[in-house]
Amino acid sequence: PGSTDRYLSSWGVQMAINTSNPAIVKIRQEKLDIMDAEMVNSDAVRIQYASKYARISNYWKYFIGQTKGLKRLDVYDKKVAIENDFRNWINQDADRIGKYGEALPLIENAYKTISKYALANMYYREAGLRGPEILSLAGSFKGLADELAKETPDQEKIGKMKASLKAQSDAYFKDYYEPIDRKTFASMMKMFNEDVACDQKPEFLALMVKKYKGCFKDYADAVFEKSIFT
């Protein structure tokens, strides 16, 4: 039914405090601000986006609170102390060294590798997959696109996919306000471009930055005026 971060190592706690949580909060704050600006001016939009706003806001508040709690309770130092005790216990016995001697170094090295990509991964998830609604809708058509690309597509399968996607699209556009999504797209792409390391950005983003001379509003306008998903 759920998951927990209770058993994170000190390196995991450090990454949450310094990288992952701040990124989630920053990105979601931007999404909420964009929604707020439109919802305050229209009861219809406010009703359309009430559930979406609450969904984004819930985890925004969660990660703000988690970060405050981790700092206030000094969780990082407590984790370090536990790991030091574990390390000392291991080093008291040759058999333990053989069984567990590499445990903490392996975890530490794994986090050293993960931490290099943690910010980019969070932006990919929060500003990409969970960012503009247009991207999630387009992604739901991948299965149909893959089937149609086959040498001999399964027509029965295609028919079922089309029916399912039509129902999904009808529900999607019922609570969709294009100006919010257009502004969100521009903002998310801008944040991704500014905050993620150059060597971890997708090639297409660099091409779009060059094509639209760094104007993400123009980039968003071009996408939304041409896309079949808007």
Locations of the language-model features?
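Terminal presequence/propeptide segments associated with secretion/organelle targeting
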Residues: P1-T230
